Amino acid sequence: MIQSRRINVIVVISVLLSLIVSIFLIVMGNIQKEDKDTRTEPLYATKLFGTDIISVEIIADEVEWQKMLENAMNEEFIMADVIVNGTKFEKVGIRPKGNSSLSQVAQSDSQRYSFRLQFDKYVKGQTCFGLTSFVVNNMLGDNTYMKEYISYDLMKEIGVDAPYFGFSNISVNGKEWGLYLAVELYNDSYEQRVFGDASGMLYNVKSMDMGGNNADGNAGRMPDAVPDGAFPAAPDGGGSGNFTPDMEKNIKGEFSVEGIRFEGRQPGGMGGGRGSNGGSLEYTDDNVSNYSAIFNNVVGKGTEADYKRVIEALKALNEGRDLEKYFDVDQILRYLAAHTIVVNLDSYSSSMAQNYYIYEKDGQLTVLPWDYNLSWGGFQSGDASDVINFPIDTPVSGVEMSSRPLIERLFENEEYLNSYHEYLQELVDKYFADGRFESKINKISALIDEYVKNDATAFCTYEQYKTAVSSFNLLGRLRGESVQGQLDGAIASTASGQKENHGTLISAGDLKLSDLGSMMGGRGQRSSEGSEAQDTFADGINDVQAGRGPGRQQSQDINSGFIQNRQQTGNYKYLILAGALMGVLITSILLAAKLKRNY
């Protein structure tokens, strides 16, 4: 029998033990939180993407460099030293990159290719401040130098998990080369900083197959656009542009245009039959081969089990069930809000059904933005009015809503549709209202103006750039006004409604989309004695600091768009931890009371 004088000692020891356990759990929780915060703010966030203009100096053997350029279509790496923002990295792999943009430049007098830099290609384990590879894109198709930049800044503003991106001034062997866009690739580094680990799966969705040797962004070999002549340039005349399905007809069968193999569609992408290759996210059956647009472009290696999880989610989507189980609905609604505003039709929103990433973990999917150089009406658009008034509630072109289940199923849900409208309103308020869009464009222009003026290999003249910036200012302002009008009900928010009430649409006036640059809008090239190579570049997305001058001190809040969502998950973990601690304390007290009572 325990002597009564020992009971108090036992009680004290029990309580002390519970406190020790509690303190231990709290300390471990804080350590885990610190580790997570470290993962979400890698060194390359500040060292690489934390400056106004990223400086990239390439030092390569002249003979090897020229040989690489002359054989760019082979996409073969050469070894070079690279100085990034003053830090030298030796034996870095570099090669041309792109798809149709690569062939377009190769067929011109220009050598202004987009490039991929692979820091561990020749030196195992080497990184650029923790990043194994990134790309620099060459501004093809964008006289403004900032359409994609702004598109992804909008994504970041509304909380989408976009990659880091920033303007980059390139030099080669001491000579100025040009102003590019540096882009973080979707890979393990991205997963680690955004999701806390690299255990998920990434798929680069591309719906057309095109010849080539290497995949950009660690994905399958797919084009960012199509060769010259395969698709029409955006006209500046009248017409209903994207909103009349009868102007776009499906052609069954297969044919090719300059090496591109089309399945069930005419050039211009007017096909996309139900579940033809998975890019539409329509469920066909459980056969992996029927989703080639997704699984042919896996980042890294995938297994049959990985693919089956995606197909299971697509089946649920098409059946309209368990959406929040299989999809990160809130993140996708944010993505759709920004995506709709910028009118990118070389995407899921059109018959192309491509140019986005799928991230899958534990059976749940989300969509990540990619390849917005042809946004703001640079692809398949009618006239400027079509872009300005692009309908927010039927944001598709050349296809029916029913063939884009990710949009249709979410918009069928009144709660989800209301959230989508709230995100649109938030973007209008923060990004467009009261001259905010014009202010941001002017700040970015002030940052890059001298670089553009002195861009030795530019695809447009400095005067054309200035005209493009002015036109972009107007386009953005009018687009913001139209979205606000659609949210208020003053302008119809569906394609059919706009057709019936055409008089309520906002007029574009004399605005010409071609002034901004488009896929086929050849503008000449300063370094090529008037050659007119013009196309789209692949895989470009940059980061800019929301609400401030572009690129300045991005490290302080560059992750603001996604950290809040991730911290919510962390808060739930701490609630569980608090509950566990409470259980330990209660158990200890009850045990002590029982001992006191018994003895």
Go through the PLM ranges and name each one:
Residues 1-599:
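Phosphate/dinucleotide-binding and metal-coordinating scaffold of catalytic cores
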